[in-house]
């Protein structure tokens, strides 16, 4: 996996990431170049129902928050599972993902695998952009080559803009 942001329920209201910028990055042979995962399971209780439940839960002092996240001037070659995999909490969606001047190319011989470390997610291969529970996505000059199926797979995405 390439550039990842990982959090989960239970990390708390002080687990806030906002204004993060990834810029001028080159990646080769990564499984999934961009992963934002709010169902991260690598903690002792990470596989429990509180962390992995896909239904909205009350927002409380244990709910993390992901604000504005920006990726600019990035090239990823020979990706495998997914180009972009953004998985927010239903009760606390990812606020904003902005991508500018990004190129992702898939390995022609890619194998299927798990794009994010979360339970009950299907194995994927050459998945272009997956987003669930994201309030705002903006793509400017984002090129993805060699993907299979639909370019965009969205669920509960508020505003989407691409140019």
Regions found by a protein language model. Give the residues of each.
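Extracellular/periplasmic carbohydrate-active domains that bind, remodel
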Residues: 1-163
């Amino acid at each position: 996996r390439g550039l990842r942001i990982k959090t989960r329920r239970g990390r708390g209201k002080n687990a806030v990431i906002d204004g993060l910028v990834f810029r001028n990055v080159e990646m080769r042979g990564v499984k999934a170049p961009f992963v934002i995962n709010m169902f991260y399971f690598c903690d002792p209780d990470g596989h429990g129902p509180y962390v992995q439940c896909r239904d909205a839960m009350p927002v409380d002092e244990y709910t993390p928050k992901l604000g504005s996240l920006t990726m600019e001037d990035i090239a990823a070659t020979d990706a495998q599972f997914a180009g972009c995999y953004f998985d927010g909490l239903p009760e606390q969606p990812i606020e904003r993902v902005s991508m500018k001047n990004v190129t992702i190319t898939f390995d022609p011989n890619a194998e299927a695998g798990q794009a994010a470390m979360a339970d009950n997610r299907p194995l994927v291969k050459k998945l272009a952009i997956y987003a669930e529970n994201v309030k705002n996505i903006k793509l400017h000059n984002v090129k993805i080559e060699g993907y299979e199926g639909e370019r965009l797979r969205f669920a509960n995405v508020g505003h989407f803009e691409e140019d």
